[in-house]
Amino acid sequence: MDSAAPSPLQRIDQDLFDAVAAAAAGSPRRRRNHNFHAPSDRVQRFLNVLQPGTYVRPHRHRRAQPGDGFECFLVLQGAVGLLLLDAKGRVLQRERISAAGPLRGIELAEGVIHTLVALSPDAVMMEIKQGPYEPAADKDFLPGFPLEGSEAAAAQEAAWRALFGPGDDHLSPAHPLP
């Protein structure tokens, strides 16, 4: 599921959502990507399916190549919480992004430290960002946060998920982003 399909037309339908969600549920990481791009493509396009309990270590993207290193998230099924953090790991802003709205997607500028939490089972996001994909340089992780798979990571994910109460569709920042 992680490689691009050779077909000139790639369907984005419920069958695909269900297949990738099942793979995510069976994964120790509790998430799975389905790429529509080749690693060398100038634009990365993929589904990112998250299950509750997945831990996304806080990170930012910095590009070595010229261009705008944006990241665009559009939730197609379920709900996801986005947290923007400062350099010390403090939450600056929380956003509930949901296929049921009112906020269904965001575009995030390069260099912004962030993490995601699954707020529903089988949460499906379409992500678009500038390529090519360079695994060694894709993410700059924020120091001081636990590694994936640890008990501390599970506790951190639960604490972040608790920041999103039921029905909190948009929570304003405590203070503006730098």
What is the meaning of each model-derived region?
Residues 46-48, 65-66, 70-75, 106, ...:
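His/acidic/aromatic-lined binding-pocket segments of jelly-roll/cupin-type domains
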Residues 40-41, 65-67, 99, 108-110:
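Short solvent-exposed loop/turn micro-motifs enriched in small/polar/acidic residues
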Residues 86-114:
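Short acidic-glycine-tyrosine-enriched beta hairpin
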Residues 90, 115-178:
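Double-stranded beta-helix
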Residues 1-47, 95-98, 159-178:
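A short, N-terminal "cap"/entry segment at the start of jelly-roll beta-barrel domains
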Residues 51, 69-87:
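Glycine- and acidic-residue-biased ligand/ion/polar-headgroup-sensing regions
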Residues 29-30, 48-67, 99:
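Conserved short histidine dyad/triad with adjacent acidic residue
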Residues 58, 82-84, 106-108, 114-119, ...:
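Short beta-strand His + acidic residue motifs that chelate non-heme Fe in jelly-roll/DSBH
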